[in-house]
């Protein structure tokens, strides 16, 4: 069955490419960017995303590709950069990428209160949207995104329906299959009619992706660690520019050697989990690769040290999946699997293999630098060699599915040194377009507890969740009750006013007829 589906998908992709080339490119090639046409012939995922959004109907997919490619050329999407956007707009902080929702999707923030409807700036705002989406699409090919419309403190002068429609079209036509959901926070009641129009733009299939929330419901979609305080969250993030804020990856703990107290804590944890093995092999920050100038004595000590590392990492399960990049093969390909706390297997392994003819420098960064220790996190790898990187949660901190790791790699000149000072200088000077990047998600393996213990934990968790749900429902009920009371009071007031006006009118009519007949 799966094989048939794969064959059908391949046929649809091939037919789409062939027909687009024959029916559109020959006549309208000047309307498209040649880079987009070339990418269409090479990137199966890109073609499949358009087919998916048009339910695998090739005729509809071709129309969508035509519209999308014309838009990409009109906006010069492939050439958009920071210099294409007015600096004041980047400094404003109305549109940016930051954080993740509970499903691990990146958050695309639209702070509506910072937008003023103005025909002079609408094109720049649209280009900023396109800039962020294209930047994200190139880094996270095919991974969904959650749009956060923050409408708190929003007035009518901030509502631009043309701009909203453009954002909707970006996900309907220009970046299909990228939309996870649209979360609308604290929408003013006066905008209800306007968003009925938005629903019609989305279409019946995508309407379910629209989530209207207040402070009470927002945590159903985003955890407090990625919500700002005005949404009831604890995220200390404050927007500023420069630099661009979408790079949430930071240096993990102890890149340049652990702090004494932290090292002692880690040593105790490892002694308990691994018997008498020491941390020397995994806390060594020296680059594993040997330079050409190293002497035989150093070579012997390095060899012994590497053998120790090998014996240490034998306790880890080698990842099976492999991402094949131009500089490094990285294993695992997409997800880091950490053992459960109960199993004691908290650490995991990343294997890097240099597939070039030169030394490759690498760095490992993470979205949660306070939670993880990475050894080594900044080093180099000889041609054809492999390096094992050990990643472990720090202390008692737990692994989250929202955590991410970024591996950065760049090819070094043969004459370059690989010491800490040389590596630091190298990363300052290497051009951005020479750096290979690959991202990894985190995943916790289910606990291997006995069923009886699992049942107790499950009952306890269900009890806590039920209590929390009841509390939320009670709050909502009280809020609804308060609104009903307000409406009732207003209704009584209107009835009293109407009664008073009726009495005045009746008195006037009686007086009129009395004066008429007397």
Swiss-Prot record:
MSP domain residues are: 327-445
Q: Which UniProt keywords apply?
A: Chemotaxis, Endoplasmic reticulum, Membrane, Transmembrane, Transmembrane helix
Annotated region (Disordered) at: 252-312
Q: Site annotation (Required for phosphorylated FFAT motif binding): which residues?
A: 363
The listed locations are: Endoplasmic reticulum membrane
Membrane topology recorded in Swiss-Prot or TrEMBL: Single-pass type IV membrane protein
Q: Some GO term, biological process aspect, for this entry: which one?
A: chemotaxis
> Quaternary structure per UniProt?
Homooligomer. Interacts (via MSP domain) with STARD3NL (via FFAT motif), RMDN3 (via FFAT motif), OSBPL1A (via FFAT motif) and CERT1 (via FFAT motif). Interacts (via MSP domain) with STARD3 (via phosphorylated FFAT motif); this interaction depends on the critical phosphorylation of STARD3 on 'Ser-209'. Interacts with RB1CC1 (via phosphorylated FFAT motif), MIGA2 (via phosphorylated FFAT motif) and OSBPL1A (via FFAT motif).
| Entry text on domains | The MSP domain is required for binding to the FFAT motif of target proteins. The CRAL-TRIO domain is necessary for the recruitment to lipid droplets (LDs) and mediates the formation of ER-LDs contacts through an amphipathic helix.
Protein's recorded name: Motile sperm domain-containing protein 2
Q: Record the organism.
A: Mus musculus
> Which gene produces this protein?
Mospd2
């Amino acid at each position: 069955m799966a094989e048939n589906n794969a064959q059908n998908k391949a046929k649809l992709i091939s037919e789409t490419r062939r027909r687009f080339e024959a029916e559109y490119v020959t006549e309208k090639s000047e309307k498209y960017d040649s880079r987009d046409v070339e990418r269409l012939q090479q990137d199966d995922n890109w073609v499949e995303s358009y087919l998916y959004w048009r339910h695998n109907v090739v005729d509809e997919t071709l129309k969508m590709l035509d519209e999308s490619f014309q838009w990409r050329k009109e906006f010069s999407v492939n050439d958009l950069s920071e210099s294409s956007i007015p600096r004041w707009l980047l400094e404003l902080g109305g549109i940016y990428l930051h954080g993740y929702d509970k499903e691990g999707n990146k958050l695309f923030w639209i702070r509506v209160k910072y937008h003023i409807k103005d025909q002079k700036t609408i094109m720049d705002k649209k280009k900023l949207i396109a800039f962020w989406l294209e930047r994200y699409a190139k880094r996270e090919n095919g991974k969904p995104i959650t749009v956060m419309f923050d409408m708190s403190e929003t007035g009518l002068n901030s509502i631009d329906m043309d701009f909203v429609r453009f954002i909707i079209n970006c996900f309907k036509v220009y970046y299909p299959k990228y939309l996870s959901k649209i979360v609308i926070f604290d929408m003013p009641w006066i905008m209800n009619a306007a968003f009925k129009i938005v629903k019609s733009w989305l279409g019946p299939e995508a309407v379910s992706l629209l989530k209207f929330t207040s402070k009470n419901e927002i945590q159903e979609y985003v955890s407090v660690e990625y919500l700002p305080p005005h949404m009831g969250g604890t995220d200390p993030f404050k927007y500023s520019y420069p630099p661009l804020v979408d790079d949430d990856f930071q240096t993990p703990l102890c890149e340049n050697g652990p702090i004494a107290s932290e090292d002692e804590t880690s040593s105790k944890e490892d002694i308990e989990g691994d018997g008498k093995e020491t941390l020397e092999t995994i806390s060594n920050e020296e680059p594993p690769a040997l330079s050409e100038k190293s002497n035989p004595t150093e070579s012997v000590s390095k060899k012994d040290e590497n053998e120790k590392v090998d014996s240490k990492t034998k306790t880890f399960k080698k990842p099976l999946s492999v991402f094949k990049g131009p500089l490094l093969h990285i294993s695992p390909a997409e997800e880091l699997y950490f053992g459960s706390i109960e199993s004691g297997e908290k650490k995991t392994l990343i294997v890097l293999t240099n597939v070039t003819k030169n030394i490759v420098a690498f760095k490992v960064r993470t979205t949660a630098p306070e939670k993880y220790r990475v050894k080594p996190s900044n080093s180099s790898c000889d041609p054809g060699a492999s390096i094992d990187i050990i990643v472990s949660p720090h202390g008692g901190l737990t692994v989250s599915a929202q955590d991410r790791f970024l591996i950065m790699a760049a090819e070094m000149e043969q004459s370059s040194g690989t010491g800490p000072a040389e590596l630091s200088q190298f990363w300052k000077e290497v051009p951005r377009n020479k750096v290979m990047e690959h991202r990894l998600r985190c995943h916790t393996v289910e606990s291997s507890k006995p069923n009886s213990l699992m049942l107790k934990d499950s009952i306890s968790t269900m009890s806590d969740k039920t209590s929390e749900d009841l509390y939320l429902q009670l709050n909502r009920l009280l809020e609804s009750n308060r609104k009903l009371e307000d409406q009732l009071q207003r209704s009584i007031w209107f009835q009293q006013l109407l009664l008073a006006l009726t009495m005045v009118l009746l008195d006037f009519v009686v007086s009129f007829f009395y004066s008429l007949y007397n």
